[in-house]
């Protein structure tokens, strides 16, 4: 009963509901940690990959990518004619740049989860067959250049490192009780 229990859930609301159900059934619910899959994966990376241990959060999370992308898009006006035209439109340019950077950061976050091979392939820049996505590959390459000490610490790269580590190392994981609850579908990296 005193062993820490980690529950991987699809939403914080579901986590709260589970804690209430456990408390109702057992009279108390303590030492229960409900986490989203991405949070669990970051903790897994930190437990197995030494380079991630000093980082509280990923340098590639959407909020950080928003600000980095904003700076890099602004510094590279030749990145995409479409972006240049959009930013030249009416209204507050800085607001438009921020909102665009935020959308791109969220898109990259989804790519890291659902299209990891794209991101791994893009580290060297765009390829001929990418067409309209070539500016995205170029922006990703600029982000990677801007983070030379962390380029191997994005979700797609970390996932490969963890799988390799789990195949070759017998290190015990820090969880004694781990449950997955209410996840009907999961992307490849989860």
Which residue stretches match the model-derived regions?
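Conserved RecA-like ASCE P-loop NTPase motor core of nucleic-acid helicases/translocases
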Residues: 2-14, 179, 183
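Flexible, charged surface loops at secondary-structure boundaries
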Residues: 1-3, 167-178
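Segments forming glycine/polar-rich beta-alpha architectures that bind adenosine-containing cofactors
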Residues: 176-190
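Basic/charged alpha-beta structural segments of nucleotide/phosphate-handling enzymes
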Residues: 9-173, 188
């Amino acid at each position: 009963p005193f062993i820490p229990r980690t529950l991987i859930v699809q939403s914080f609301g579901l986590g709260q509901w589970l804690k209430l159900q456990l408390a109702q059934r057992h009279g108390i619910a303590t030492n229960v940690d409900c986490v989203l899959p991405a949070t669990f994966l970051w903790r897994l990376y930190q437990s197995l990959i030494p380079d991630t241990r000093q980082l509280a959060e990923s340098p590639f999370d959407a909020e950080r990518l928003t600000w980095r992308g904003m700076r890099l898009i602004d510094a590279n006006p030749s990145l995409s004619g479409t972006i240049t035209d959009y930013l030249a439109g009416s209204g507050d340019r800085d607001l438009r740049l921020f909102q665009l950077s935020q959308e791109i950061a969220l898109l990259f976050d989804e790519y890291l989860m659902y299209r990891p091979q794209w991101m791994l392939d893009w580290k060297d820049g765009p390829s001929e067959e990418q067409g309209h996505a070539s500016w995205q590959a170029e922006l990703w390459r600029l982000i990677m250049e801007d983070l030379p000490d962390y380029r191997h610490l994005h979700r797609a790269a970390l996932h490969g490192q963890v799988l390799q580590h789990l195949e070759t190392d017998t290190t015990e994981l820090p969880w004694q009780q781990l449950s997955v609850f209410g996840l009907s579908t999961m992307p490849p990296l989860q």
